[in-house]
């Protein structure tokens, strides 16, 4: 794009290189210095060990990596200054007068797409290749404290495209002309915080799975191509990054006290102003859950404002795949409607800031199934028509023709089933999918209906009949007779996607007309999926279709190929969307980087944290794996237990890559629980759920009951002494010195919590005592010392010692100096540094009690969350 003010280049006043600058020579890393070039005497004073925000002189906005992404190819743009890691840059000298701009969040550098020398070539985030297009000369602006950045490759400067003031305007290279949109101020980042004793900036990423959870909604913006959002039942909301071809999480900022907001009941993207996004957030309607909230964004989910609601929402309850319940009036986009589960219909006329119940709407409770309103949909702009579906067996569809002032039940509607989705096509037809239960489980019947909104005629257009329902529904905005639907709970032979190009008169199955590529997430296989309640057709591309499943997303760019007898191609479209919930994780020394145990997916082994695993832990597959442990002195020996497979426990002798099920089990009727393995692998102690601990000395072939411990006592192995195990039970610390056969009490009056043993140090124990803080024992649990610096602790883990120290680095999930978060200590708990930030809080991850450092890489830490996957952090 050409710069509209480039009619005549405005030259800068140049100064000759000063003698002082000539004498300085090449600046040294880690000190403050003056930058200089052959054409500029002294530009800005820069601390090479610091990070800076680069503020546009023209707009006042800062240089920003889109969506906190860590992916190569992510666009660089200007954005409102939020002082977040993706807006912070280190200026790294190349040693010859040029600099790389290193992003704090990703560790990657700013470069020009394709190494281009062309005008208007886009700036993007790239892996450092020491390329000339990634290197910049920094020059001063006469009479100002601003600087310019000139590309070594092209000789052009960093420029905000079109002299724009807009949020999200792209950064490009353009010939220098002296414009304010090419000038930048360097604002040094001050690392501070009440809980910090030093700089703790980290880059956070997911150990990728690509999906792993239930995607309940997919919503395209109707005005802007490529703008797409996803909602999940317990992992928050996401925005699609077209350039990086992956999802960007939008709700990781939700903290522990607001964890209930990570279940997204519904979302709406503004058809008039694409920057506006609304989330109806709330996970449960139980008494113990907090009320829901509307999260309002004017920058596509980068930041939110919150309106608390006087009722609860149920983003992880029955019927969560229905919708959308939150919609925007296409004629008056400041007006929104929200259908609730137990409180009727609500309206806002000020972009979601305030809400009032629509008193005229007849249903103000949960209706037949307790799930209330299933969907709300507006008619064409200016029509004043609204349709509302309700989960009621007798009256399930209402219509208003006066903007919601009055309502009538639609005559002739089907009964006995409840609507899942309702979509109006461009020709005035209303399509609806029905099931005999809210779903996503428990559905045994269903149908698809078409309603002629002008004539009032109903027609059953179900593509098939059987012991299953219908849920997902999409109509092509460009072709109103093209309709797609999905089955729900058709467990045999499998669920199905149907497609019609004649308004439902005839249908084609898609599973037998498609080729499926699961290479992004091989563990999912190429089956069509289940719980396919979210289905959407791109309003700008009829071939681009996506649908959600209980495990993620499938996508196609040629779904319309089957219309003419061809074959469509589908691929996993869930990269970046991580919705798994974890029970345990370990990082054995010198072996696999990470082995996990989690719900629904069982577990994975990672040799490369940047790549999705090739498959689940198998032989046996334990779909809900609750515990994993390894032998400290023989880390190739790994054990895991859980439920949901043919066996409940297994052993690996090669670091988690291959497995064999235990030949025996303590209590055949029980499962799950926790397992510990001796430091040398000579014995296992397994406590199944509701049972006493049992011990095996023959690698799981036989088991004998442990003496001295009660039911559900969790056992921990000493990480040095092979004969020693510990258990914290009802405030008493027990120990065994005979390989777990017999336990005796050593200390009492202890708080409940999670007990952990330090690798390689006999008798060194840490107790995360919940609200009582953190306790430490160096004598095998005979005595404990409470750390005054820690107010509460959910879990503590250990990793490689910091350079120059010998004791393991400590990682804490807890509260220090009034601040809750993730902390690191390199001095045995005397001082703590917070290493997560307010943008990375992941809801109630503390409740999972999963934190471990990496034994081979100092500073790396792994955090298991409840719905946002396995997070790992590295110092930036």
Residue ranges and their predicted role:
Residues 2-43, 189-876:
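Extracellular glycan-interacting surfaces
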Residues 22-32, 44-191:
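Lectin-like carbohydrate-binding module/patch detector with strong preference for beta-trefoil
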